[in-house]
Amino acid sequence: MQWLRTVAALREQVASWRGSTIGLVPTMGSLHEGHLSLIRRCRQECDHTVVSIFVNPLQFGPNEDWDRYPRDEEGDRALCEAAGVDVVFAPDPQEMGADPATAGDRTWVMPPESLLQTLCAPHRPGHFRGVATIVLQLLNLVQPQRAYFGQKDAQQLAIIQRLVQDLQIPTTIVPCPTVREADGLAYSSRNRYLSAVERQVAASLYRALRRGYDHWQAGDPSAEGILAAARAELERTPELRVQYLELVDPQTLQPLSEVKDKGLLAIAAYVGQTRLIDNLLLSPEGVDPLPQEQQSAVPPSPKRGRRPLIAIDGPAGAGKSSVARAVAAQLQLLYLDTGAMYRAITWLALQRGIPLDDAEQLTQLAAQTQLTLQSGPSADEPTRIWADGEEVTQAIRSPEVTRWVSQVAAVPGVRQELVKRQRLIGRDGGAVLEGRDIGTHVFPDAELKVFLTASVGERAQRRQHQLQAQGQVVSLEELKAQIEQRDRRDSERLISPLRPAPDAILIDTDHLSQAEVEDKIVRLYRQLLERSGAAHFDII
């Protein structure tokens, strides 16, 4: 895969593909399962796949979130590599002529006024002008036969379709269904802004849309009835601040009084400070089915030629390490404690007086330190680890290291160095890896992904018991505060933030024994092997 940043390099590569079918997937990065569904379809239908990653300043208003929009270049690179993308085009604003300081004097593409009278356009003046300008630029640079856009951004889709039609651009715009989580929430990069409570509130957007759809399916085609049904559902969630709820024609975006053939029921609402949009097509074809929990709990078949990898992620204190060790022992797989690697670098930095905000020194430390890991003699004992020949197995579990490890792990250079080592160890499969971004970044192609979680109180108690066993006394309240602070750091960092992979199986360990959690994962692994007919792997 090539990662290109300049127009010249992109043009040179595209020219070499002359005579082949090229597909374009335009994105703003911070990739998730919605983007990956577009990429997979593009790869199925085209000889070459180009993914653009560009957080477009021209489509953000003065008080919007351009400066804090999620960016995860390392994670995006790994996902694109795993998905088989040929080229990622990731220019900066200057390369695209989109520097806000000088953009006022550039050529703009103005969508038809009739498409800007409803939905998001009145609330985001200039937004779709910025979208249309950059999309036209990308179509001109890549000259794809096909370009893939998600139905979730329905107004954008309608505008791009009209743009291509009016300007006679020889590109087929391919609409792709909205991809949702099990509770209906549409995948969005802005979902990262949501707290756990806000995440539950956000799920009511889909419930409201579905209520309107069901009302239409029951035989009432009137906009009044459909909107009233959706609105009644929204009123059950007062935490939502609805910006608009509208029923329009999917192509013209003009308001409908009734749905005769097709309609677009669309919503925008604020959950806390986060603005979310969603929509449903009201059409005879019906609504795309939600992913069922039973389906999401069935892992995909393992990659040919390697034993399956198990990726276990989750917040501090969720029980990842002890569970991963035990699962690896039961299945006779290699266990790799990635967290111990970050702890070792943190401990060394503290010992040597390296400032924890000095990214350059920390990166150099990670690159130069020789780390040696060895599984403990039993599943009950932690991984033994040596840093430059000195065993630091116990030292890296100190409260001071625990306090600072997430800050060190957030340094891009440190992550890059350690992830390279982790990938070398796990590339042949047959391993259990645990951490915070194994399934989303280190091994996004892992065959089995698990996300363990537990309440702050439960995790604090577990940590207290660990420390007491080591002869250390720390109050429960202090541990709770440390865990909450670490959760914030891990989930809000820009580089590989803590989040479940889209296809991860979530296990809440609050009311489960360790043995019960282990049993769940072992059964899922064996189920994976049975589905693939992989008896030749000779696991236990």
From Swiss-Prot:
List of catalytic residues: 35
Arranged from A to Z, the UniProt key words for this protein are:
ATP-binding, Cytoplasm, Kinase, Ligase, Multifunctional enzyme, Nucleotide-binding, Pantothenate biosynthesis, Transferase
Q: Where is this region: Disordered?
A: 288-307
Region (Pantoate--beta-alanine ligase) location: 1-280
Q: Which GO terms describe its biological process?
A: nucleobase-containing small molecule interconversion; pantothenate biosynthetic process; pyrimidine nucleotide metabolic process
UniProt-listed Pfam families: Cytidylate_kin (PF02224), Pantoate_ligase (PF02569)
Chain segments carrying region Cytidylate kinase: 281-540
* Top-level lineage group: Bacteria
- EC numbers: 6.3.2.1, 2.7.4.25
Please list the residues that bind (R)-pantoate.
59, 156
Pathway annotation from the record:
Cofactor biosynthesis; (R)-pantothenate biosynthesis; (R)-pantothenate from (R)-pantoate and beta-alanine: step 1/1
- What residue range is the signal peptide? none
The UniProt family comment states: In the N-terminal section; belongs to the pantothenate synthetase family.
Protein name in the entry: Bifunctional pantoate ligase/cytidylate kinase
Give the species.
Synechococcus sp. (strain JA-3-3Ab)
Q: Where is the organism placed in the taxonomic lineage, from the top? A: Bacteria, Bacillati, Cyanobacteriota, Cyanophyceae, Synechococcales
Per UniProt, what is the name of the gene that codes for the protein in this document? panC/cmk
